[in-house]
From Swiss-Prot:
It is found in: Cytoplasm. HAMAP family: PlsX. This is Phosphate acyltransferase. The lineage of its organism: Bacteria, Pseudomonadati, Campylobacterota, Epsilonproteobacteria, Campylobacterales. Pfam families: FA_synthesis. Keywords: Cytoplasm, Lipid biosynthesis, Lipid metabolism, Phospholipid biosynthesis, Phospholipid metabolism, Transferase. It comes from Campylobacter jejuni subsp. jejuni serotype O:2 (strain ATCC 700819 / NCTC 11168). Its EC number is 2.3.1.274. One of its GO terms (cellular component) is cytoplasm. Its main location: cytoplasm.
């Protein structure tokens, strides 16, 4: 059975939504949950029927969301430090944390190490498109990148799309300000030349192409990726709020909205980041799923499912093998 360490107290809303997410996941799939935190607080939240799947790793501190990621290695009593350490010692198969993302990245990179051939790890996230989903990476691990970093991100993204998303030949693109090969800054142009070695590389793509269903993996540096991610979250929230405002304007609008309610629910589910759970940190020697600090129980549940799928896929070995083809 898969063993997953869960940073049980690291999110913005404390332990309650995290534990609720763990319990929801256990009701669907059996796994061993190692809850990292204060067991005196956590134990009363666990129903007797699920106690057999729960273990505890004591941690007396929570890494502050206002803390500096560079201090993560010094604070050995924090929940995220203890969780990553369990993975390093191979006592668990994966870690899920909604705590400080910078601390999670820093600890995972320094304590677990990087995969062979990877110079920097990347955070990958799923974005909704009109057909299914687009994998976007990096979305925050590296604000400044070299062309070789983006090439490695491309390989990791392609393998993830193939092994986890079950896309046999994922269409891979590079984010730029135009589709033409000559477009972009020096980093984009240099990265484009490297990515031409990859058979599934289809060239440059613009920001709008994330949503048209014509690409499966989009590669960029962590600065651009994070801006895109946050902008999309804001746009989605604004659109639904505008719809709500318009519906209230007339009786006919309210009737129309009532008739459209099933469609609106499907649309909201498709565009809701909570449905995707968390973002895998690709390139480290282990499975670390980074969840949004504001994750509710549904997001935590889905992040756990991501961790299970990742752990069962042996994706890290596939990434190393794929990179080996180009480094030989």
């Amino acid at each position: 059975m898969i063993n997953i360490a869960i940073d049980a107290m690291g999110g913005d809303f404390g332990e309650k939504p995290i534990i609720e997410g763990v319990l929801k996941a256990l009701e669907t799939k059996p796994f061993n949950a190692i809850l990292v935190g204060n067991s005196k607080i956590l134990k009363p939240l666990i129903p007797k029927k699920l106690e057999q799947y729960i273990q505890y790793e004591e941690a007396s501190e929570i890494f502050s969301m206002n803390g500096n990621a560079t201090d993560a290695l010094k604070n050995k009593e924090t929940t995220i430090y203890k969780a990553i350490n369990l993975l390093k010692e191979k006592k668990v198969d994966a870690v899920v944390s909604a705590g400080h993302s910078g601390a999670s990245m820093s600890l995972a990179t320094l304590k677990l190490g990087r995969l062979k051939g990877i110079s920097r790890p990347a955070i990958a996230t799923l974005m909704p498109n009109i057909v299914n989903k687009t994998l976007l990476l990096d979305v925050g691990a590296n604000t400044d990148c070299k062309a070789e970093n983006l090439f490695q991100f491309a390989i990791m993204g392609e393998v993830y799309a193939r092994e986890i998303m079950q896309i046999q030949k994922p269409r891979l693109a590079l984010l730029s300000n135009g589709e033409e090969e000559c477009k972009g800054n020096e980093l984009t142009k240099e990265s484009h030349q490297l990515m031409k070695k990859i058979p599934n590389f289809i060239g440059n793509a613009e920001g709008r192409d994330i949503f048209n269903g014509e690409i499966d993996v989009l590669v960029c540096d962590g600065f651009d990726g994070n801006v895109i991610l946050k902008a999309c979250e804001g746009v989605a929230t604004a659109i639904f709020q505008l719809l709500k405002n318009e519906v209230k304007q007339s009786f006919i609008s309210k009737i129309g909205a009532l008739l459209m309610k099933p469609s609106f629910k499907k649309l909201k589910k498709h565009t809701d980041w909570q449905e995707y759970g968390g973002a895998p940190l690709l390139g480290v020697n282990g499975c670390v799923i980074i969840s949004h600090g504001k994750s509710d129980s549904r997001a935590i549940k889905n992040a756990i499912f991501q961790a299970i799928n990742f752990s069962q896929s042996h994706i890290n070995k596939f990434i190393e093998n794929e990179l080996g083809k180009y480094n030989a």
